[in-house]
Swiss-Prot record:
One of its GO terms (cellular component) is cytoplasm. GO terms for biological process: 'de novo' AMP biosynthetic process; IMP metabolic process. PANTHER family: ADENYLOSUCCINATE SYNTHETASE. Its main location: cytoplasm. It catalyses: IMP + L-aspartate + GTP = N(6)-(1,2-dicarboxyethyl)-AMP + GDP + phosphate + 2 H(+). GTP binds at residues 12-18, 40-42, 305, 331-333, 411-413. Its EC number is 6.3.4.4. Plays an important role in the de novo pathway of purine nucleotide biosynthesis. Catalyzes the first committed step in the biosynthesis of AMP from IMP. Pathway: Purine metabolism; AMP biosynthesis via de novo pathway; AMP from IMP: step 1/2. Coiled coil: none annotated. This is Adenylosuccinate synthetase. It comes from Leptospira interrogans serogroup Icterohaemorrhagiae serovar Lai (strain 56601). Belongs to the adenylosuccinate synthetase family.
Length: 425
């Protein structure tokens, strides 16, 4: 059975968790492949909201095994807190969760250094990090100095950890004038973490390959989106990993032959958190109106998201990079009650129309817009395409034509049931 991938096409917060939740009922295994606790996935089931940061949202389904892949950076105590919270809400997390032995561990010194670096930068050089230590942990991974989950299975890790803590404390003191972190506190935390998850630690790449060959249905989920990819996003205003298709394969160990479906998730408008260029951004009252209508505040930090119109060039870029085979369009209901809805269909730079989404100079482009007549009726909760207002259907059809990929799922509200899918079109 081939694997499927859900990937964000914008700057994250596209509604991946809802789509993953919708697809989970037909899935045996869900795998998180990159990122860390800097991401928040929100799922609403029967009016109750659940927020996930590290644990795959498929944990709420009885039949689904959840896997944390090798591409994730894991804050061990935050992870246990999240698992315990979900256990109290009735989900047997520890009975259905597998953890890659190659997953890198994130420690307090990572977040402290991250926060210190961001604080010392001038406003024009700030990245807009969540200060969770994600990038610093990935840097240690690339420097080959980090500790992995599997290292904890041998007590010799303590020698390496002591050396790392001493090194990071020197950095905290000499560069940032910050107090040291405690080796003993970190080590005791790791012992507690291991006592909870030791039986869950395995070679997940081998496990996934074995299960796929048995015909199991596997769904890959990431954090953030293509616009935040460290290689193909709006660098340097990006995350420190690859949320794109290539990152999914590396972050799970699944070979490309197993991957057949790549589902791109996109909002019917655009948002981003933090710094960086945003060509279609709405400022002032217009931006605030869309933010309030869409409830655009970060699930992890609570930060207000910047809001703007749909960007076709960005979506075409995401389709190319990820090999997207279908699109799920979310939050179309938020656009109700607009007289007109502009869509960015291209860019000009120095008077010349660009062929594609640029790697540099996005902050200097002139946006080419086409306007669509809006619809006034409330479409929240509609589950059949034909019941949508004609102007809404025209908007969706135009996006599909420009993107060049079939839109076969439309979300009309936060709940699982507020979804138009498949035969409804």
């Amino acid at each position: 059975m081939p694997a499927s991938l859900v990937v964000g096409t914008q700057w994250g917060d596209e509604g991946k968790a809802k789509v993953i939740d919708f697809l989970s009922k037909d899935t045996d295994i869900i795998v998180r492949y990159q990122g860390g606790a800097n991401a928040g996935h929100t799922v609403v089931v029967h009016g109750k909201k659940y927020v996930f940061h590290l644990v795959p949202s498929g944990v709420i389904y009885d039949q689904t095994i959840c896997v944390i892949g090798n591409g994730v950076v894991l804050d061990p105590l935050f992870f246990i807190e999240e698992c315990d919270r979900l256990q109290k809400e009735g989900f047997p997390v520890f009975d259905k969760l597998l953890l890659s032995d190659a997953c890198h561990l994130l420690f307090p010194y990572h977040s402290q250094i991250d926060s210190a670096r961001e604080t010392t930068l001038s406003q024009e050089h700030k990245i807009g990090t969540t200060k969770k230590g994600i990038g610093i942990c990935y840097a240690d991974k690339m420097m080959r100095t980090g500790l992995r989950v599997g290292d904890l299975l041998d007590t010799s890790y303590q020698t390496r950890l002591k050396h790392l803590v001493d090194e990071k404390n020197r950095e905290l003191d000499k560069l940032y004038g910050m107090p040291p972190v405690s080796y003993n506190d970190i080590n005791e935390g790791l012992k507690f973490f291991l006592s909870k998850v030791k039986k869950n630690i395995i070679n997940t790449a081998y496990y996934l390959d074995t299960e796929l060959k048995k015909g199991k249905r596997v769904l890959l989920e990431g954090a953030q989106g293509t616009g935040l990819d460290v290689d193909f996003g709006t660098y340097p205003y990006v995350t420190s990993s690859n949320p794109t298709t290539g990152g999914a394969l590396i972050g799970t160990g699944i070979p490309f032959q197993h991957l057949k479906h790549v589902i791109g998730i996109t909002k019917a408008y655009t948002t981003r958190v933090g710094e960086g260029p945003f060509p279609t951004e709405l400022l002032g009252e217009a931006g605030e109106k869309l933010r309030q209508k869409g409830g655009e505040f970060g699930a992890t930090t609570g930060r207000p998201r910047r809001c703007g119109w749909f960007d076709v060039e960005m979506l075409k870029h995401s389709v190319r990079i990820n090999g997207i085979t279908s699109i799920a369009l979310t939050k179309i209901d938020i656009l109700s009650d607009y007289d007109t809805i502009p869509v960015a269909t291209g860019y000009k730079l120095n008077g010349k129309t660009l062929d594609c989404f640029p790697s540099q100079g996005l902050d200097k482009v002139e946006v080419i817009y086409e306007e669509f007549p809006g619809w006034k009726s409330d479409i929240s909760g509609i589950c059949e395409f034909q019941k949508l207002p004609e102007k809404c259907k025209n908007y969706i059809s135009a996006l599909e034509k420009w993107i060049g990929v079939k839109i076969n799922l439309v979300s009309t509200g936060p709940d699982r049931k507020d979804t138009i899918h498949g035969d409804s079109f």
